[in-house]
Curated annotation (Swiss-Prot):
Activated by the chemical integrated stress response (ISR) inhibitor ISRIB which stimulates guanine nucleotide exchange factor activity for both phosphorylated and unphosphorylated eIF2. The keyword Lipid metabolism does not apply. Component of the translation initiation factor 2B (eIF2B) complex which is a heterodecamer of two sets of five different subunits: alpha, beta, gamma, delta and epsilon. Subunits alpha, beta and delta comprise a regulatory subcomplex and subunits epsilon and gamma comprise a catalytic subcomplex. Within the complex, the hexameric regulatory complex resides at the center, with the two heterodimeric catalytic subcomplexes bound on opposite sides. This is Translation initiation factor eIF2B subunit beta. Pfam families: IF-2B. Keywords: Cytoplasm, Initiation factor, Protein biosynthesis. The keyword Chloroplast does not apply. GO terms for biological process: central nervous system development; cytoplasmic translational initiation; myelination; oligodendrocyte development; ovarian follicle development; T cell receptor signaling pathway; translational initiation.
Amino acid sequence: MPGAAAKGSELSERIEGFVETLKRGGGQRSSEDMARETLGLLRRLITDHHWNNAGDLMDLIRREGRRMTAAQPSETTVGNMVRRVLKIIREEYGRLHGRSDESDQQESLHKLLTSGGLSEDFSFHFAPLKANIIEAINELLVELEGTMENIAAQALEHIHSNEVIMTIGYSRTVEAFLKEAARKRKFHVIVAECAPFCQGHEMAVNLSKEGIETTVMTDAAIFAVMSRVNKVIIGTKTILANGSLRAVAGTHTLALAAKHHSTPLIVCAPMFKLSPQFPSEEDSFHKFVAPEEVLPFTEGDILEKVSVHCPVFDYVPPDLITLFISNIGGNAPSYIYRLMSELYHPDDHVL
């Protein structure tokens, strides 16, 4: 059919364009935009492609998911959305197959040992499966749109009047969180500039426009100022499987200073940033950029004698984190494993 062929070629072009964008680093898109675009493409794949059963569909989603994640391994949000869709397919197939949700969750060590690695049969055909999966993906897209508002709505539970709050760099989620609290509370925000990119300046300008008392400081002053701080509130790029963070460079220094002064460290991050990856997976963890901000090309004599690496992210271990605030509430780092089992199936951790 010519119409189907045209649809297929248009979808292939869109996926190819998305993969190219990922290879170039994702441009200026936020993690939320990446998550939404990934879900949109996967939804189109499900509706436009011909597949007979859940097994065929999962193979298709995995194949395209591997392409997307390989283009930019450090953009973990893309892989997370692929895993969420695979989990949705499993759940909807299970409902039509007459299996309860509870039987899918491996809740205890005994169940893990006795499950024996049996693989489920996804070869049965169910006519309503496609419509059910699309409906579930649409619900997930609606959930994505409300994540920032849901996190910001919890601000008054954590920020009190006349407190001194410290943050680092720029995070849209933290900005919304602080602005929501500022509607009813007066407090002072200290922003570490996050050199060499200095995204903290943008954060400080946005907060001051809302009438929030804001101070920008250099990263070197974090430890000296920490004794005056009541809470540290930060964003993150990824929450890893062990409850640790992959956050902007400089966050580890901030977390260590907070731990030394017994200052609570709160991480504001939506659930789509929760990844089943571990910090030992180097390809997806590390990302380096050009070091011209650290050592400009005008320093020609020095450039010949040194090799400069400019990492984008820091690893922050879970023992430095007090609380995670997500769109579904607040949780300790030790609870991350449970959230992981609710969001992703163990067989989908590696695509």
